[in-house]
Amino acid sequence: DQAGDPNLYAGGPCYVGIDIGRRKDLFVIWVFELVGDVLWTRQVIERRGASFAEQDQLLDEVFSRFRVMRCCMDQTGMGEKPVEDAQRRHGSTRVEGVLFTSPNKLTLATVGKQRFEDKGLRIPMGNQALRADLHKLQKVAGPTGAPRFVAESDAGGHADRAWACFLACNAAETGPIEYAYHPVPRKDTLRGNRRTL
């Protein structure tokens, strides 16, 4: 399978999801490339116990290697500062912080589940850790009866890979940011100066 190999990146728009973890849980960056209408996994970076400086460096490398249209990051708890720093470095229109509230987790899981059901994404074959993370997620009724997602934490993490994947799916939901510009004449042409080469 071609999913998960960054060397197969074809230059298309990319969408990134990041689950922040520092000590017990994993720090995971998930990169999807949009090819047609399918999100292909291009890279999954996992680190346990990575310093925030290393996490920043890994994210900067992703932004320099891939054409990142949008990045959704876990902003909950210790994620506040990494999100703020990433927005400062890469722009607040490209980096969005997502608080892991029950409604937001439900939205993320629903978007991810829909992508899987529609065969709209490709993940690396044989990634047992990811499959285990996906199976850790359970939809349960909250105290008010509203559905919410929970995941048991174990030595493999707290469904960190699944949340990073779902955050990347969420980043792709808005599609590329459209913009336009109007060129202005160069200063030297406004003054009537001619440039020679």
Q: Residue locations for each model-derived region?
A:
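RNase H-like, metal-dependent nuclease domains and their acidic two-metal-ion catalytic environment used
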Residues: 1-102, 106, 110, 114, ...
